[in-house]
UniProtKB/Swiss-Prot annotation:
The keyword Metal-binding applies. It comes from Thiobacillus denitrificans (strain ATCC 25259 / T1). It catalyses: L-methionyl-[protein] + [thioredoxin]-disulfide + H2O = L-methionyl-(R)-S-oxide-[protein] + [thioredoxin]-dithiol. Residues 9-131 form the MsrB domain. This is Peptide methionine sulfoxide reductase MsrB. Zn(2+) binds at C48, C51, C97, C100. Gene3D superfamilies: Peptide methionine sulfoxide reductase (2.170.150.20). GO terms for molecular function: peptide-methionine (R)-S-oxide reductase activity; zinc ion binding. The keyword Cytoplasm does not apply. HAMAP family: MsrB. Its EC number is 1.8.4.12. Keywords: Metal-binding, Oxidoreductase, Zinc. The active site is at C120 (nucleophile).
Amino acid sequence: MSTDEPKTDAQWRAELSPEQYRILREQGTERAFTGEYWDHHANGEYRCAACGAPLFSSSAKFDSGTGWPSFYEALNAQAVRERTDTTHGMVRTEALCSRCNSHLGHVFPDGPPPTGLRYCINSASLSFHPKD
């Protein structure tokens, strides 16, 4: 299978943990203050846990006080795709991996400068790669 072909549901289930599958493929959310990266401070790059695409730099990570990893910008303009999410009786902006369309979390307009954005991301959606 080429990397351009979408994976089947069975392939995603085989590759991801049950928690990762629930969040990445079923648009779930992990409980606040429980994820591996909410209080993580190492230098490096956060990538999509499903496909490995680079998403965020640790230099853009900040403590939002919410209990989820928060970033004020994506690694680049192509890394994260956004779409309107109207679930749970709210209108929010969903953040998805541009490469594999996996659910990452949501984007809110209450972040710090320079962008004023807060990418509120599930730890289960991420893998961390330390800076060499």
